Amino acid sequence: MKKLIGNDWDEVLAPAFESEKYQELRDFLKEEYQTKQIFPDMYHIFTAFKLTSFADTKVVILGQDPYHNPGQATGMSFSVNPGVPLPPSLKNIYKELYDDVGAVPVNHGYLKKWADQGVLLLNAVLTVPYGNANGHRGKGWELITDTAIKALSDRGKVVFILWGKFAQNKIPLIDEGKNVIIKSPHPSPFSADRGFFGSRPFSRCNDALIKFGESPIDWQLPQEVNPADMA
C-alpha cells in the first residue's frame, strides 16, 4: 500500500487506511476537493502525523477540526500559518501559557516547535469545507484519529490534553492507568473563563512527563518563524 505519511504511523494506522470506510472517505474527499474550497490543502492533511511520529509522541493536544477560513489551517490543531491573525482560542492559550510557565507570547500562531518535540497536534477530523465548521464530521476521519488515540493509549506514557467536551468525549479510548489526562473547558472566549484560565495544563503536562521519565516540553515558541522551517 502507498505510504500516506512516511513514518511509523503508516504501520500503526494501516488497518484503518485499508478499511472500506477509509476508501469511502477518499472518494468523498476527491469530490469535495474538486468542487469546493477545502482546508487544509491536500498536501497538509496529515501534517500532524508527519511532524510527530508514533514513537516520538509524548503529548496529544486534541482539537475538533481545522480552521475553516482561507490561510489558517496548517494540519496541526490550534496552529495557524505565520502572518494570519491569531484566532481567539489561540490568544487565550498564549495567555494561559504565559501565566502558567512564563512563555512570552509571540505574534504568530505557528506551533511546529511543539510538534518537533513530541506534541501531536491532532484534530479529530482532518478536513473542513470553507466556512463550515464540522462540515466533514462523521465522514470517516474519526476512524483514523480514534485508531491513533487508542494506539498511543495502549503504548502508554502519553499526556492527553483535552480541552472542552468534544475532546473529552475521547476519554473512553484512553487507558488512564498508563497515561495522564489533563482536561479543562475549551480556550474559546465562550468558555475560557469557566476553568481554562488557571488550569495550568503546560506545567502539569511537564510534571507528568518527568514522572514518566521523559524530557519536558519547552513551550516557548520562537519570536519569528523561519520560512525554511515550515512544514
Curated annotation (Swiss-Prot):
Gene Ontology cellular-component annotations: cytoplasm
Its job: Excises uracil residues from the DNA which can arise as a result of misincorporation of dUMP residues by DNA polymerase or due to deamination of cytosine.
PROSITE patterns: U_DNA_GLYCOSYLASE
Protein name (record): Uracil-DNA glycosylase
Keywords in alphabetical order: Cytoplasm, DNA damage, DNA repair, Hydrolase
The organism of origin for this protein: Lactobacillus johnsonii (strain CNCM I-12250 / La1 / NCC 533)
The keyword Cytoplasm is annotated on this UniProt entry: yes
Family (UniProt): Belongs to the uracil-DNA glycosylase (UDG) superfamily. UNG family.
MF-aspect GO terms: uracil DNA N-glycosylase activity
Keyword hit for DNA damage: yes
Disulfide pattern: none
Pfam families assigned: UDG (PF03167)
SUPFAM superfamilies listed in its UniProt record: Uracil-DNA glycosylase-like
GO biological process: base-excision repair, AP site formation via deaminated base removal
Active site as annotated: 65 (proton acceptor)
